[in-house]
Amino acid sequence: MNAVEEIGKRAKLVTSDVANLAVDIRNQILLDMSSALVANWQEIVAANKKDLDAATQLSGPMRNRLTLDQKTIGGIAASLSAVAKLADPLAGPYDNWKNHTGFKIVKKTVPLGVVAMIFEARPNVTVDAAALTFKSGNAVILRGGKEAIESNIILTNILRNVLRKHNLNPDIIQLITDTTHDSVNTLLNLRDYVDVLIPRGSGQFIDFVVKNATVPVIETGAGNTHIFVDESAKQDEAIRVIHNAKTQKPAVCNAAEKLLIHEAIAGEFLPKIVDDLLAAGVELRGDQKARSIDSRVIGASAEDWDTEYNDLIMAIKIVHNNDEAITWINDHTTHHSETIISEDLNHVTDFMNTVDAAVVYQNVSSRFTDGFEFGFGAEIGISTQKLHARGPMGLSALTTIKYEVFGEGQIRE
């Protein structure tokens, strides 16, 4: 049995320990974890510096996601406190009813068991995942990217030390420190120990996990996110929404990557949005129609339309009408978040009913696809599949159903 299998075995052994903890204890531990992160912020920053010094090939936005300082650590700690304040996802009241023979059936909410997370260079995910799985009564196995290994080690050690202080087995939270592909391949196939696997990262990485895992997977989305500006759009509002969705945090999955513009307003609107986005440092690529309107737009390749840039790059297409926009989006979407900027109720209704995505917006930045913004608290990821969970996954997505039956000797005739 190799090291990853041992981690899986140990996680399975402690599932009942965390599942049976009273919610008051779970909440106090989360608060203590929050305090421990704040108290050890200098050690965390020092470890993070080692990661940053080694991460010479990362793009600017990806490097920003990796960086930890006192302020970001304070924000991560605050998210732990926020999770502690959320309602217990395991609490009742539970639905119950009686069978015709008289026995009682209770439909109970229970933890999934062992949750494995594979993610890239985002050390905040280490803490978010640990907090949400712990609050929902699960054990967690974390496997972060090599770019954040030093940060992940110290963060998990701090959280595990808090568990020890509460006389709990630290294996409730475990980190795989082997950053080779071998550890990923092993984790993908730990069906005996892992109940569900949640990958977060690029579309290519998530596709690899989905195609190669024998463990059940909740597919979280790459975000090839579109904004369609309809002919009825308020143009100043559209510019504000597009600017925010593209430039605020370009490396995240809910950032906008593609812009579709109705041809009736393209001549007027395109130069305005080009002015705005170029001033923000965005590289603009587009189809022939877009380039004929504004020569500052460079040519887009066929690959551009299916690429999640995670950077200050955006591709622009001019469309004939609402129907073409919807068809184009459904052909190229990653089923994450899609937006229409429009005042035409019929067009909005068609867009909402027909676009196949977890979240569909009217006149709102896609940057709001987020557990906190949706009122769920921190999120474990954004699911782009339709089974078990879809969209921002909060605490309830980390639970399942168990039926408890109480009777008095009934037998089936």
Swiss-Prot record:
User: Which Pfam family is one of those matched by this entry?
Assistant: Aldedh
Q: What EC numbers are recorded for this enzyme?
A: 1.2.1.41
Primary location recorded for the protein, binned into one broad class: cytoplasm
Task: Give the superkingdom in one word.
Answer: Bacteria
Q: Gene Ontology cellular component?
A: cytoplasm
The subcellular location is: Cytoplasm
Which UniProt keywords are present, listed alphabetically?
A: Amino-acid biosynthesis, Cytoplasm, NADP, Oxidoreductase, Proline biosynthesis
Q: Name one GO biological process term.
A: L-proline biosynthetic process
Q: Which CDD domains match?
A: ALDH_F18-19_ProA-GPR
Pathway per the UniProt entry: Amino-acid biosynthesis; L-proline biosynthesis; L-glutamate 5-semialdehyde from L-glutamate: step 2/2
A single Gene Ontology MF term assigned here is: glutamate-5-semialdehyde dehydrogenase activity
Q: Which InterPro entries match?
A: Ald_DH/histidinol_DH, Ald_DH_C, Ald_DH_N, Aldehyde_DH_dom, G-glutamylP_reductase_CS, Glu-5-SA_DH, GPR_dom
Under PANTHER family, the record lists:
DELTA-1-PYRROLINE-5-CARBOXYLATE SYNTHASE, GLUTAMATE SEMIALDEHYDE DEHYDROGENASE
Which family is it part of?
Belongs to the gamma-glutamyl phosphate reductase family.
Q: What does this protein do?
A: Catalyzes the NADPH-dependent reduction of L-glutamate 5-phosphate into L-glutamate 5-semialdehyde and phosphate. The product spontaneously undergoes cyclization to form 1-pyrroline-5-carboxylate.
Q: Which HAMAP family match?
A: ProA (MF_00412)
Protein name per the record: Gamma-glutamyl phosphate reductase
- What is the scientific name of the source organism? Leuconostoc mesenteroides subsp. mesenteroides (strain ATCC 8293 / DSM 20343 / BCRC 11652 / CCM 1803 / JCM 6124 / NCDO 523 / NBRC 100496 / NCIMB 8023 / NCTC 12954 / NRRL B-1118 / 37Y)
